[in-house]
């Protein structure tokens, strides 16, 4: 599988904050940083985002496993093979159930516990539940993280069929 096996987006609006998540300043010059990427099928998205950071921080990827289907985690890793190799982060892959924003949140909390002095750049370019967990984490921990998003313009007719509906309560 290549990074472009799944063309789910026709273009990208560029790296800019999500509404309500703009930050005037990132980490201080002496504060170490991590790039935490929730990976999906579009293997070029995480690399496009990290290439905007100077210098590129250490990468910790998160893969949705178990996935929505049994083969999806393997497809995700295959589609991100170049990114994982370029940033030498295969051994740092973390897992969070693809359909669970709470596991995504906990994965970020675990990374923060492992790297308590690091600023987290979070790229939610994987599943929507992972994006929800990342946003929830950013709301609760705004002083040491920020969301980086590339605003994809979706391909028409990119998916078909129906699946299980997931309902979450964040109260």
Ranges and model annotations:
Residues 1, 37-47, 66-68, 121-132, ...:
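Gly/Ser/Thr-rich loops at beta-strand to alpha-helix junctions
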Residues 1-19, 66-68, 75-84, 154:
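Long, charge-dense
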Residues 2-6, 142-171:
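Short, flexible loop segments at boundaries between secondary-structure elements
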Residues 4-30, 41-47:
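Active-site glycine-rich loop that binds ribose-phosphate moieties when present
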Residues 33-34, 58, 119-121:
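Structural motif
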Residues 38-111:
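Redox- and metal-dependent alpha/beta enzyme cores, enriched for Fe-S-associated oxidoreductases
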Residues 50-55, 110-115, 135-144:
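Short, surface-exposed basic-aromatic patches at helix termini and helix-loop junctions that form
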Residues 100-118, 130-136:
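A short, acidic, amphipathic alpha-helical segment used as a generic capping/interface helix at domain edges
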């Amino acid at each position: 599988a290549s990074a472009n096996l799944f063309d789910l987006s026709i273009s990208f609006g560029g790296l800019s904050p999500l509404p309500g998540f703009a930050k005037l300043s990132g980490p201080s010059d002496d504060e170490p940083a991590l790039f935490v990427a929730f990976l999906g099928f579009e293997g070029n998205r995480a690399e496009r985002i990290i290439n905007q950071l100077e210098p590129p921080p250490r990468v910790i990827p998160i893969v949705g496993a178990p996935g929505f289907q049994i083969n999806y985690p393997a497809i995700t890793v295959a589609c991100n093979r170049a990114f994982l190799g370029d940033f030498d982060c295969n051994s740092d892959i973390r897992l969070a159930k693809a359909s669970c924003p709470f596991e995504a949140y906990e994965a970020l909390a675990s990374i923060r516990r492992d790297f308590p002095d690091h600023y987290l750049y979070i790229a939610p370019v994987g599943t929507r539940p992972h994006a929800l967990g990342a946003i929830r984490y950013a709301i609760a921990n705004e002083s040491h993280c920020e969301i980086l998003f590339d605003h994809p313009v979706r391909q028409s007719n990119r998916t078909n069929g129906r699946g299980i509906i997931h309902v979450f309560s964040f109260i």
